[in-house]
A protein has these predicted regions:
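Cleavable N-terminal export/targeting peptides
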Residues: 1-48
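Outer-membrane beta-barrel transmembrane domain signature
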Residues: 26-33, 37, 94, 155-164, ...
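Hydrophobic, lipid-facing positions within transmembrane beta-strands of outer-membrane proteins
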Residues: 51-53, 71-75, 79-82, 132-136, ...
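Membrane-embedded beta-strand positions of outer-membrane beta-barrel proteins
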Residues: 53-55, 77, 88, 103-107, ...
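Transmembrane beta-strands of outer-membrane beta-barrel pores
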Residues: 57-63, 81-83, 107-113, 142-144, ...
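Extracytoplasmic loops and strand-loop junctions of Gram-negative outer membrane beta-barrel proteins
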Residues: 57-59, 118-121, 148-150, 202-208, ...
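Solvent-exposed loop/turn segments connecting transmembrane beta-strands
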Residues: 62-69, 87, 95-97, 128-130, ...
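Repeated loop/turn-to-beta-strand initiation elements of outer-membrane beta-barrel proteins
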Residues: 83-86, 101, 144-147, 175-178, ...
Length: 269
């Protein structure tokens, strides 16, 4: 019970630190989580507890018509212990490892939601709330790359489900580590319909009714980590996301691809 109580306390602290100031910075945290988890997997079997604090800045182009960029600046909290791991808005309970495979239970916060008025095309739309997700993940630390599989189900609001398959490979040259990464994310029709659908009561002359359908997004990027000292590092992540037809067919959306940039500083204790 103490482990689960600690997990709850860490989760609350991580979400509060990451989301309190800038609710639209979830896209920034997305790759901060990936960056921190990559380091965490390397010492998954270690009993040493580590902490980290930092600051992240990110810019992500929104798929919504006339929305512009999502920009956020927010604090980063990292924690890695024997049973628990927190990276930004993601908290894991470690189930254990078998050979090169690691398994976790996962809780995650995402602010995919919007309010009427966030963009002209969203005027008159009902509010779409942010999401709290529960699920699990598995990682395969292969000799040539690291592969991850994540399944999440929304704890309310959208009733959505997502499945994400990711791959990355790091190359270290002196103090610089380059990590090309790619991912494919499937979203069920409930998720797409909640965030990109248009109900009959929301129809306008410039916005037709739309029922979302399941779709798949693909992303590719390059993350650069630079070690200032043994405890301090900076990272830069450049990526591009291609949205599936279930999203691009929505009258709320006017683009099929969106670039993103993340920059941050982390100090590990």
């Amino acid at each position: 019970m103490r482990h689960y109580q600690s997990f709850f306390n860490i989760l609350v602290l991580g979400v509060a630190a990451s989301c309190a100031s800038f609710a639209q910075a979830q896209d920034v945290i997305g790759n901060i989580d990936a960056n921190a988890n990559a380091d965490s997997q390397a010492d998954a079997k270690a009993d040493v507890t580590t902490w980290g604090l930092g600051l992240g800045v990110g810019v992500q182009r929104s798929p919504y018509r006339d929305y512009g960029n999502k920009t956020g600046v927010l604090p980063i909290l990292l924690y890695n212990g024997k049973y628990f791991r927190v990276a930004g808005t993601t908290a894991d309970f470690k189930l254990g490892s078998v050979s090169q495979f690691d398994f976790t239970l996962r809780a995650k916060y995402s602010n995919d939601g919007y309010k009427s008025g966030d963009a002209t095309i969203l005027n008159g739309m009902d509010e779409r709330k942010d999401g709290f997700w529960l699920g699990g993940s598995a990682a395969w630390r292969a000799p040539f790359a690291k592969f991850t599989l994540e399944w999440l189900k929304a704890a309310g609001n959208s009733d959505g489900q997502t499945v994400k398959l990711g791959a990355e490979r790091g190359f270290t040259v002196g103090r610089v580590k380059l990590t090309p990464h790619l991912g494919v994310t499937w979203m069920n029709n409930d998720y797409v319909n909640y965030y990109y659908g248009v109900k009959s009561t929301e129809v306008r002359s410039t916005r037709a009714a739309y029922t979302g359908k399941s779709t798949t997004n693909a992303s590719v990027g390059l993350r650069t980590d630079y070690s200032l000292t043994a405890a301090q590092s900076m990272f830069l992540d450049l990526s591009v996301t291609h949205y599936g037809s279930g999203i691009t067919d929505s009258p709320l959306v006017d683009r099929s691809t969106a670039p993103g940039l993340r920059l941050g500083y982390i100090y590990k204790f």
